Amino acid sequence: MAKPVQIEVWNPNGKYRVVSTKPMPGTRWINLLIEQDCRVEICTEKKTILSVEDILALIGDKCDGVIGQLTEDWGEVLFSALSRAGGKAFSNMAVGYNNVDVNAANKYGVAVGNTPGVLTETTAELAASLSLAAARRIVEADEFMRAGRYDGWLPNLFVGNLLKGQTVGVIGAGRIGSAYARMMVEGFKMNLIYFDLYQSTRLEKFVTAYGEFLKANGEAPVTWRRASSMDEVLREADVISLHPVLDKTTFHLVNKESLKAMKKDAILINCSRGPVIDEAALVDHLRDNPMFRVGLDVFEDEPYMKPGLADMKNAIIVPHIASASKWTREGMATLAALNVLGKIKGYPVWSDPNRVEPFLDENVSPPAASPSIVNAKALGNA
Ligand SMILES: NC(=O)C1=CN([C@@H]2O[C@H](COP(=O)(O)OP(=O)(O)OC[C@H]3O[C@@H](n4cnc5c(N)ncnc54)[C@H](O)[C@@H]3O)[C@@H](O)[C@H]2O)C=CC1
Ligand SMILES: O=C(O)C(=O)CO
């Protein structure tokens, strides 16, 4: 028997029962659901990560849809329970959905939503922040000041790397990888090398045009190159940022061998998913190469870190906050709620998950569609 969990209820007489496994930022998402006759139940349990049993208890006997989090294990057990309870839709409040077994969802006819686009710039900005913080040793310097160790300017104090004219490498030049590349190229006049399974024509055009602009103004132009292998990026780039999806092809993409291929004083940033890096190998590499620096937002066994990582002065570590701006988090909540609502109401799936702006304008009603359903094709409603 699943144990009861604490909830907060909005619009108790609503016809459709929608459960959110966590309180989410803003109220627009709640209002949009209530306006369409949903009873909204929000889990207010104090524990951060809900177990499958907790979520089973939330789903109960009748549930039309669930908004869940990337920390939860959405597989066979939960999708079968949701389907038994009459549920049509689940949405992650995240763009990444490696915590979701989409095949299991397909088996039970449950739509799986995610929240692309609204977090692109916010996530890229955190990757850029970590790049700068690592290049200029900001966290080490901050700790030094707070410890009362500053006793005057010195020529060698916290000397770091100049980004201008160096090469930024992007692995996974999708929405976020491309946004990050543009920030680093335009903001710091870095040259770009990228690796992705697909060509990023828009990104290439952007760098070409910016290079021409610089040249016309008498400055050295920036350049771009699409690498034919990830190794090329690792060997050549001074700053490397990881932005692929997490799947079988990207698990431990950065491992002992690939770390060795990188420059001794390179900077590695990860705002994608922890398991893209073999974290134990990274700790060894950081220990053996004090000039090598890393900025991590995500960890292999979140919320834990591999032994030794927290002691590394050449690592900057933050707790999975890359999408944590107010506008973005409220927007993610809205998109997740509208994914679920759209399926409940029988709306079509939005035609382009890369263009979700119409759902985010608070001054107008959102389109009658689910913004992003990743298994729409498999369920026959693309
Ligand atoms: N740290 C955080 O808070 C956040 C993390 N993320 C992570 O970032 C990921 C990317 O998000 P978006 O840019 O919106 O997705 P996207 O789908 O636009 O981009 C992913 C890119 O990775 C590429 N890719 C896939 N396999 C690859 C491989 N083996 N080698 C090289 N490239 C490969 C794809 O072709 C695609 O261009 C998400 O799946 C999520 O896991 C996203 C938002 C916030
Ligand atoms: O959206 C995602 O995939 C995250 O990791 C959180 O924003």
Curated annotation (Swiss-Prot):
Its main location: other. The active site is at residues 273, 302, 320. It holds the Pfam family 2-Hacid_dh. GO terms for biological process: oxidative photosynthetic carbon pathway. Its EC number is 1.1.1.29. The lineage of its organism: Eukaryota, Viridiplantae, Streptophyta, Embryophyta, Tracheophyta. Disulfide bonds: none annotated. Keywords: Glycolate pathway, NAD, Oxidoreductase, Peroxisome, Photorespiration. NAD(+) binds at residues 175-176, 271-273, 297, 320-323. Induction: The appearance of HPR in the cotyledons of cucumber seedlings is both developmentally and light-regulated possibly at the level of transcription. GO terms for cellular component: peroxisome. GO terms for molecular function: hydroxypyruvate reductase (NADH) activity; NAD binding. PANTHER family: 2-HYDROXYACID DEHYDROGENASE-RELATED (PTHR10996), GLYOXYLATE REDUCTASE 1 (PTHR10996:SF257). Gene3D superfamilies: NAD(P)-binding Rossmann-like Domain. It is found in: Peroxisome. This is Glycerate dehydrogenase. Belongs to the D-isomer specific 2-hydroxyacid dehydrogenase family. It catalyses: (R)-glycerate + NAD(+) = 3-hydroxypyruvate + NADH + H(+). It comes from Cucumis sativus. Pathway: Photosynthesis; photorespiration; 3-phospho-D-glycerate from glycine: step 3/4.
